């Protein structure tokens, strides 16, 4: 990032010189005919569940959420106003009261280091636990080629860690922020339910306290088209 003057990670795939990290290791249990689910263990809050085929928690997005198959820039993978901790010990609860609605909540170690098991930072030293709550609505708009899936998410987060104020007046604890993440398929090439060719759009917005966060607000918009070139049905342009 320093070489190109970018505030965000220019390549979210690059993780340094380490050869391997254990990203997640957890116990998972479903309840109520799979309408409720809980995970306990080492968890990654940026990649948890799906609902109606859409990312269900947290700050998910169907068209801008995967640095391996979509955009490389970190700000188009997750909202940079959200201070997600490294994968570490935590609890995630995901509930789907209806087919078109979900609620997700999590508490995780704010001091986590992905290179460790998580026990050192979670149970020794400051009791800093990052919390996040999200709800999403998943409408399907009618079209001649079948339903057009959308996802409209809103969430808030809480970070108890002390942060230095930029004006030098001390530190602040109990930081809070809000975010939105939206994606919508607007055009399908054919009626096959298993065929994802077509155009999808996305948008994100987030806000955080400017006195302790470098990014006080953020927005992004974009889209992707799969199968734009005839006979190249799996190619994606973003």
Q: Across the structure, where does each feature detected by a protein language model lie?
A:
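Extended hydrophobic secondary-structure segments that form protein cores and membrane-embedded regions
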Residues: 1, 39-41, 152-158, 198-207, ...
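Outer membrane beta-barrel
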Residues: 1-110, 213-222, 226-238
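Short loop/turn motifs that connect adjacent beta-strands in outer-membrane beta-barrel proteins
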Residues: 32-35, 100, 140-151, 187-199, ...
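Outer-membrane beta-barrel pore domains and translocons
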Residues: 43-45, 108-110, 155-161, 185, ...
